[in-house]
């Protein structure tokens, strides 16, 4: 699935053999990055440096390990950290930024602890470029969950961790409200309400698993979203894929949902729609089990899942059914192992520690290897 030699570029740590410790902010360090997006194969690259509450940008795709970032958004300079730059919430601050994606000609970021999604209409090309649009809040100065209300709505969010833009539609994993929101077109005004909801019966509900046991429609902790091509795309189009980390599963819709609370077609990681245990109730994982899967991406006929708490990536190809086992593995020696960095004292170019986010651009898979405070650029092995 990925090149067996390991990551071609490592960003964020001095070397692949360094001990993992919290790092002070600089142009080369990261602290628990949870998302990254390579806009084109030549760059730019944007990273959600989550623990430092900032976004880091590279003008071109990095060519050497620990290459320093060119831009920072969210802090006054590369040496600073703190939620909302230790001040008030603005169009150029973030608090626990997580999901990040190309969005039209610009960029979208799930600014999780500000309970909002930020949209730049054009790609930022400087430090602290302010966002143009905010979703989940009425304006850029607000940051309360669900706009300070106990009930949610189509224009509110609570801990949104995932965002993706696909074929003109914007999708957000509104994680704390246990749902996925969709906008039919790229929003143009602040606080624009979503058009469709998955995981809940309507826009006002927010109970985990809809207030009952898990079903093909319910969610507990949706985190990341991608689209996986079908074998017959001209007939079926893309499949929607959502990681439901709280239910230790990945949900797949065979076609793009068109109705609120539409049930998924298949789950991976569980044998039934109503089972939810991590690693299917046993200590060690298998090729068919998951433990808090946070990230997901698709490239060609591959679906790649960050099985986060098992510190590994799993790969599926082509067609899947409920509980289909993975056919590819990265980060562990076998499907029954789950140690951080494969139980090695130091991270290596092939190891992972709590990988949170994955994205793909061309032949390059970008992995937010959060527990190792680094981002990996790793080539596919077609």
Predicted feature locations:
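Surface-exposed loop and turn segments in beta-propeller and other repeat-based domains
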Residues: 3-26, 69-90, 130-153, 193-216, ...
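Signature of short aromatic-glycine-proline-rich micro-motifs recurring in repeat-based ectodomains
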Residues: 22-38, 86-103, 147-165, 211-232, ...
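Conserved beta-propeller blade signature
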Residues: 44-47, 106-109, 169-172, 233-234, ...
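Short loop/turn segments immediately following the C-termini of beta-strands
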Residues: 50-51, 60, 112-113, 122, ...
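Structural signal for beta-propeller blades
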Residues: 53-55, 115-117, 179-180, 248-250, ...
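Short loop/turn segments immediately following beta-strands, especially the blade-tip
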Residues: 58-66, 120-129, 183-192, 253-265, ...
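Loop/turn-rich, solvent-exposed surfaces of beta-rich toroidal or solenoidal domains
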Residues: 294-317
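Blade-level signature of beta-propeller repeat domains, shared across WD40, Kelch, NHL, RCC1
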Residues: 311, 354-382
